[in-house]
Amino acid sequence: MDAAAQTSLVVSEDRRHPANVICALCRLFYANNWVTGTGGGISIKHPATGHIYIAPSGVQKEQIEPEDLFVLDGVDGAYLRAPAGHRPSACTPLFLACYRARGAGAVIHTHSQHAVLCTLLFDDVFRIANIEQIKALPSGRRDAAGKPLSLSFFDTLEIPIIDNTAHEEDLAPGLEAALARHPACTAVLVRRHGIYVWGPTADRAKVYNEAIDYLLELAVHMHRLGVPPDCPIGEEKRFLRR
């Protein structure tokens, strides 16, 4: 593929094009303090071509432009575009694992402080229940017509936690094992590191990431009060620290 063809993969006036969405989300996530210091990453699969777009490693997320992005073939994972002067994302093996195992349309990786704190408070699985925001997340269940169902207010959200490794790419086996153990989960926490969140589209992945971060932050506050995040309704005062 010549230079012009490679450039055409990432240059588009369509604001919904994956290259433009990645740049916009990187700026938003930086403003939310989720991807500071070049940390974190994001990938989106083009709904029409199946090409996989990935933000590079080592680039300040709020400064990323479409020309900075890597593009992979969605079938064999071969690089269709590798911009000079940039390193492929160390998250790439994990993004690909989510695409394979979950049929995801987008994957988000942040270094949210709320995510890191919750990995210190829970062992193998983060749990929170009976909170309205849970309803923004998928349950893994479907109705009689096959339509995906969201979690209900009375459901418990469970997110598996895996241990961190010295190198990002070495997280892939642990993430794949967590996906197999928790077939309904839409996120995996990485201890002392951050979180991976995915969804069927970039819009859904964004919503899931925002909802989960809200719940993680709430869980930290509940823990400070002595209230378990999965506390049954009506028993909160029994746990409150005086």
From Swiss-Prot:
Necessary cofactors: Zn(2+)
Entry GO terms, CC: cytoplasm
UniProt protein name: Methylthioribulose-1-phosphate dehydratase
EC numbers for this chain: 4.2.1.109
HAMAP family in alphabetical order: Salvage_MtnB_euk
Native source species: Eremothecium gossypii (strain ATCC 10895 / CBS 109.51 / FGSC 9923 / NRRL Y-1056)
Function: Catalyzes the dehydration of methylthioribulose-1-phosphate (MTRu-1-P) into 2,3-diketo-5-methylthiopentyl-1-phosphate (DK-MTP-1-P).
The protein's annotated pathway: Amino-acid biosynthesis; L-methionine biosynthesis via salvage pathway; L-methionine from S-methyl-5-thio-alpha-D-ribose 1-phosphate: step 2/6
InterPro entries referenced in this protein's UniProt entry, alphabetically: Aldolase_II/adducin_N, Aldolase_II/adducin_N_sf, MethylthioRu-1-P_deHdtase_MtnB, Salvage_MtnB_euk
GO molecular function: methylthioribulose 1-phosphate dehydratase activity; zinc ion binding
The gene coding this protein: MDE1
Organism ancestry: Eukaryota, Fungi, Dikarya, Ascomycota, Saccharomycotina
UniProt keyword annotations, A-Z: Amino-acid biosynthesis, Cytoplasm, Lyase, Metal-binding, Methionine biosynthesis, Zinc
Location relative to the cell: Cytoplasm
Catalytic function, reaction form: 5-(methylsulfanyl)-D-ribulose 1-phosphate = 5-methylsulfanyl-2,3-dioxopentyl phosphate + H2O
Binding site for Zn(2+): 109, 111, 193
